[in-house]
Amino acid sequence: MEKYLHLLSRGDKIGLTLIRLSIAIVFMWIGLLKFVPYEADSITPFVANSPLMSFFYEHPEDYKQYLTHEGEYKPEARAWQTANNTYGFSNGLGVVEVIIALLVLANPVNRWLGLLGGLMAFTTPLVTLSFLITTPEAWVPALGDAHHGFPYLSGAGRLVLKDTLMLAGAVMIMADSAREILKQRSNESSSTLKTEY
């Protein structure tokens, strides 16, 4: 048993690598999906209700009547989403998310890029977690069941809550990048001192 505990105790390096890869995979995959209408449609309630983002939409107040389920095609809803700038905003967000993934993956080559990716991966969940406050669809609606509203998260709310893990993981990869930058600076300083003497 002790052998396994020692083995597990040395898992922090591999764990950090897995956190970095996981963050990159999530941002890359979801970022690429932002170019597909069903994913763009699915973020409409979050963006339309957000005081930080609703200005990107032409008519955020009208979104409810144009919501669709994943896999469902309604031409009038698609036309409204197009006119609303839903797809333009989603495409821009997709570009940002793919850039975050690439920056996070760039860490072994350039720690500063990795640090920037970690910072961006940290700030993204700060915005998305605010949706728990601003988006009514984050909570189970009052449709007759006794369990609705706070603390009963809907599927959308549960999805948003998982961003707390992204937030924590981003702190870890930022700390790792910063530690490596400081170590590199320290090594450069000591090698400069040695060459001067």
Curated annotation (Swiss-Prot):
Induction: Induced by RclR in response to hypochlorous acid (HOCl). The keyword Cytoplasm does not apply. InterPro entries: RclC, RclC-like, RCS_Resistance. This is Inner membrane protein RclC. GO terms for cellular component: plasma membrane. Residues 1-15, 107-112 are periplasmic. NCBIfam families: chlor_memb_RclC. It comes from the Bacteria. The chain crosses the membrane at residues 16-36, 86-106, 113-133. The gene is rclC. Residues 37-85, 134-197 are cytoplasmic. GO terms for biological process: response to hypochlorite. Disruption phenotype: Mutants are more sensitive to HOCl treatment than wild-type cells. It comes from Escherichia coli (strain K12). Probably involved in reactive chlorine species (RCS) stress resistance. Keywords: Cell inner membrane, Cell membrane, Membrane, Stress response, Transmembrane, Transmembrane helix. It is found in: Cell inner membrane. The keyword Transmembrane helix applies. Its main location: membrane. It is a multi-pass membrane protein.
